[in-house]
């Protein structure tokens, strides 16, 4: 199904009604710019159906926070392998921000490894991106990152598409 098809546009509009960021993440994942995405806010069956209608596989994963409270995450991808990797590593487990976890999540979410390593050492370190460029990313770019520079045109294209839907 082509990105400019009426069905895709309609699903994106409906996802956008829920949350712009959800629609944007979904299309970045559908178009292969992100191998896997995670939605940390509640998502009902209708939202899951919309993700599936645009060609994404979905899975809801239960995790815990430090207080022991259960939280539900929705993960989605075009590849069952990424969903299985995430589920095996994180289902039923507490959320943690260890360097090991951040590296693994960075891999799954398609973040440049150099940016992940820099973020672990120095979160939100100054980079050379204009604020409007950093805003369309889901990772914090490291200084002079060549991979981020290569990703940005695709991210901008999808961001503009979602804005126009």
Predicted regions and their residues:
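A conserved ligand/cofactor-binding region detector
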Residues: 1-93, 104, 111-117, 121-165
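An amphipathic, hydrophobic-aromatic interaction surface with interspersed Lys/Arg
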Residues: 99-106
């Amino acid at each position: 199904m082509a990105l400019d098809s009426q069905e895709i546009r309609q699903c994106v509009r409906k996802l956008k009604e829920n949350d712009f960021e959800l629609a944007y993440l979904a299309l970045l994942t559908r178009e292969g710019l992100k191998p896997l995405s995670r939605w940390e806010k509640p998502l009902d069956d209708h939202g899951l159906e919309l993700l599936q209608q645009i060609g994404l596989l979905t899975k809801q994963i239960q995790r815990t926070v430090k207080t022991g409270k259960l939280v539900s995450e929705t993960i989605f991808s075009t590849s069952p392998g990424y969903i299985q990797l995430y589920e095996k590593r994180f289902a039923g487990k507490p959320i943690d921000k260890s360097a090991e976890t951040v590296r693994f999540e960075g891999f799954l979410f398609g973040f440049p490894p150099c940016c992940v390593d820099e973020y672990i050492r120095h979160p939100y370190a100054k980079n050379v991106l204009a604020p409007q460029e950093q805003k369309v990313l889901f990772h914090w770019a490291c200084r002079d990152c060549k991979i981020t520079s290569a990703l940005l045109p695709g991210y901008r294209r999808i961001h503009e598409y979602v804005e126009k839907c």
